[in-house]
């Protein structure tokens, strides 16, 4: 009969006849259910007496009715149910204080999620009598209503929220404190966005910086080393080149822009004093100008190269003095000439002497000799 009571209709249009079993052969009065109810109360009282002082460890029966539920006061149970109710009234009064105290402790010991489930179940199984109290009629196990969340309506969701409110002292203040950090972060983010330059500003600055750098006569490597000497951040020539070409990330462009701007201001302020300008230029790796060698001087170097492809330091010095060139220029020219000779000679072919190669200038080319033999 307890399982049948779960599926009773929710309206109050039931007849006043005693509760009948659905089978037509066996007709039972409503007092049978009330007798079972009385037995369940007596068993629960015996359990409380046996475990005196430890009633918190007990859990009420799954289908144990609440003393204030509608199953005891409903008019649809009939007149005989009223007489049975008066018979167990004394036991229920003794049970009322301990049972309510035990149930309140169980509710507070539950987690917020299980607490919310209990109230959600009470919302769907609403009392059938308008004179019922706010307590739920029956205490159900949570495993029977695992899919109840999708069935809840707007009223149930508001009830679900209201049952979580007692867990907080001030829900309004709590919600404000939770929502305030994102607003603070958003304000801080807006402030940082205002300070950061836009992409158009970076593009314009990169263009102006390149023009000013070329006008002042500094290379990209000079700027990178000068930044390391002045501000402690050494940048390579590739980094400065990528900045001017707008190939760095936006974050790195924003970091490098103020340093380059300070370097430009420092350079512009020292334009009138050559000593300071030379000092800044000396901090970087100064690139020498490309040396232009005249045709007569180049021929003299070629003749010396045919005699000695790898001259000694003394020979380089004497040759530089005779040609009125710097010693470093003559040394670099011989290095480049030897590399050129290696590129011209195929790999695996023995390298002939320089005199033999250039002494055969009057002989016909090799391809001409091959064509003559074929004919």
Curated annotation (Swiss-Prot):
Residues 1-29, 67-138, 151-200 are annotated as: Disordered. It is found in: Nucleus. In embryos at the neural fold stage, localized primarily in the anterior neural plate, and localized mostly in the anterior region of the nerve cord of neurula stage embryos. In tailbud stages, expressed predominantly in the eye and brain, with weak expression along the length of the nerve cord. In adults, expressed in skin and brain. Residues 162-177 have a biased composition (Basic and acidic residues). SUPFAM superfamilies: Homeodomain-like, lambda repressor-like DNA-binding domains. One of its GO terms (biological process) is brain development. Residues 194-268 form the POU-specific domain. InterPro entries: HD, Homeobox_CS, Homeodomain-like_sf, Lambda_DNA-bd_dom_sf, POU, POU_dom, POU_domain_TF, TF_POU_3. Signal peptide: none annotated. The keyword Transcription regulation applies. SMART domains: HOX, POU. Residues 286-345 bind DNA. Keywords: Developmental protein, DNA-binding, Homeobox, Neurogenesis, Nucleus, Transcription, Transcription regulation. Residues 107-117, 129-138, 151-160 have a biased composition (Polar residues). One of its GO terms (molecular function) is DNA-binding transcription factor activity, RNA polymerase II-specific. Its main location: nucleus. GO terms for cellular component: nucleus. Acts as a transcription factor. May play a role in neuronal differentiation. Belongs to the POU transcription factor family. Class-3 subfamily. This is POU domain, class 3, transcription factor 1-A.
